[in-house]
């Protein structure tokens, strides 16, 4: 492909569930394999089968039957038992290209189906073919899903080529992706019981695992961080390999072996989440986690964290703020970060419900901090479109603990208070929607009922 360097690295995944977060350079291998190992599948021998016949059916090049015979230690290719299960390297099997489907997209995402062709905008439900190059811009995100349920999510500012995406003759799925830059989260589910392999290649390293969920990142100094959420991975650097189990992470500086794995930090719990938030901005605080130097906080529209509205790393004790969000349900999640930059175990997202509508009316009269002599006073406000009625309160204190008058079912845009004493009062109003949801209160208005000034004597008498 034009503009892409030669591929030198591989990320291999096989199993029920896999999640990987990669930057451009990573070094990971399966515990039971070397970097040069090739995945294999088992093919059962049936009565009447011969080795050459099986190879003709399953291999791209049937003449490579000798390699199969050598791998399975078969001396006589004409004599194989129906009870045997033969190992076949996946890369030798026939394959049919399969398309991916765009199942989530946000922002500007483009695709180039072949080298030299024009880039075009990618849309929801588009099919993406083998050999395509995907590119997300600064605010772009896209998810590609395959027929077996496997998927990958490209984060903003990412470039990736779908080098090989095939379904092999044995039912084995092979996916080889080339991650040129950025981040990807991959999810592999084995729904059919058949094997599958998911490889992500980067410019200068190799990563591999089997049946696991993990994150990997590389910073500007090319240091690698690996965090395992489920299963076990092997991390190799400088000819040394460490086993990283569920709930552990390791750190690799460029040119050095991996550090001994350490436990990942638990997530910080969000404090004092309200059932409903009626106004913004929102400020969230988190409980402190021992040994955490910062927290990564994500505010998203979905529980999986694909459609992220805001993401930020904050220091312990700082607040996480949301300045813009409409009515709806959102999901807040945070992870602890230790002194090596390893991100901890994810928490279940907290459900955040925002409902600001109907908004409180704009009060026309009386005027704030004004004095009035009549003991009957008319209150007027502007109509709110999605309000069917209004709730007003008049109190002797600004905390509204001493309410002297209230109206809960006011259909008009005015309210008359009669018989008020000569003192200072406080007024507020809220809108009520058709579903009886009461919105937030208006700002408190202060007014005073004062006795009329005495009539001066008529000096003419």
Label each region the model flagged.
Residues 35-59:
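Primarily a LysM-type cell-wall glycan-binding module
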Residues 310-316, 405-411:
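Short beta-strand segments within Ig-like beta-sandwich modules, predominantly Fibronectin type-III
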Residues 340-354, 434-452:
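Extracellular fibronectin type III
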Residues 36-37, 57-97:
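Extracellular LysM carbohydrate-binding repeats and other cell-envelope/extracellular binding modules
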Residues 325-340, 419-435:
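Beta-strand-rich modules
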Residues 294-307, 387-405:
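Extracellular low-complexity, O-glycosylation-prone stalks/linkers
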Residues 282-291, 377-387:
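Conserved aromatic anchor
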């Amino acid at each position: 492909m034009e503009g892409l360097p030669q591929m030198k690295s591989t990320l291999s995944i096989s199993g029920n569930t896999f999640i990987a977060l990669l930057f451009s350079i990573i070094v990971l291998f399966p515990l039971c394999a070397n970097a040069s190992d090739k995945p294999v599948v088992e093919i059962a021998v049936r009565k009447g089968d011969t080795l050459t016949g099986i190879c003709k059916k399953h291999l791209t090049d049937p003449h490579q039957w000798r390699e199969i015979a050598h791998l399975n230690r078969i001396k006589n290719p004409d004599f194989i038992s129906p009870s045997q299960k033969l190992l076949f390297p996946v890369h030798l099997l026939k394959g049919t290209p399969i398309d991916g489907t765009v199942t989530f997209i946000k922002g500007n995402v483009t695709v180039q189906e072949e080298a030299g062709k024009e880039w075009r905008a990618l849309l929801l439900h588009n099919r993406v073919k083998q050999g395509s190059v995907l590119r997300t811009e600064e605010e772009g995100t896209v998810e590609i899903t395959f027929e077996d349920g496997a998927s990958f999510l490209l984060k903003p500012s990412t470039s990736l080529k779908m080098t090989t995406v095939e379904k092999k003759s044995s039912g084995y799925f092979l996916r080889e992706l080339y991650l040129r830059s950025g981040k990807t989260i991959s999810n592999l589910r084995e729904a059919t019981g058949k094997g599958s392999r998911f490889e992500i290649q980067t410019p200068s390293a190799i990563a591999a695992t089997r049946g696991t969920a993990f994150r990997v990142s590389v910073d500007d100094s090319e240091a690698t961080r690996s965090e395992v959420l489920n299963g076990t991975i092997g991390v190799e650097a400088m000819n040394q390999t460490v086993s990283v189990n569920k709930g552990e992470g390791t750190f690799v500086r460029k040119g050095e072996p991996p550090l001994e794995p350490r436990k990942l930090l638990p997530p910080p719990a969000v404090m004092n989440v309200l059932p409903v938030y009626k106004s913004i901005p929102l400020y969230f605080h988190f409980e402190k986690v021992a040994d955490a130097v910062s927290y990564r906080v994500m505010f998203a529209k979905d529980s999986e964290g694909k459609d992220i509205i805001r993401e930020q790393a904050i220091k312990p004790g700082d607040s996480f703020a949301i300045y813009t969000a409409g009515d709806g349900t959102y999901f807040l999640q945070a992870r602890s970060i230790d002194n090596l930059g390893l991100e901890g175990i994810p928490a279940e997202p907290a459900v955040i419900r925002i409902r600001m509508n109907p908004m409180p009316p704009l009060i026309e009269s009386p005027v704030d901090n004004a004095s009035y002599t009549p003991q009957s006073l008319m209150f007027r406000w502007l109509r709110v479109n999605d309000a069917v009625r209004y709730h007003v309160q008049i109190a002797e204190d600004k905390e509204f603990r001493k309410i002297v008058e209230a109206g809960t079912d006011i259909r008009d845009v005015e309210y008359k208070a009669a018989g008020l004493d000569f003192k200072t009062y406080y007024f507020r109003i809220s809108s009520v929607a058709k579903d009886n949801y009461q919105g937030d209160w208006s700002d408190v208005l202060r007014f005073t009922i004062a006795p009329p000034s005495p009539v001066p004597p008529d000096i003419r008498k």
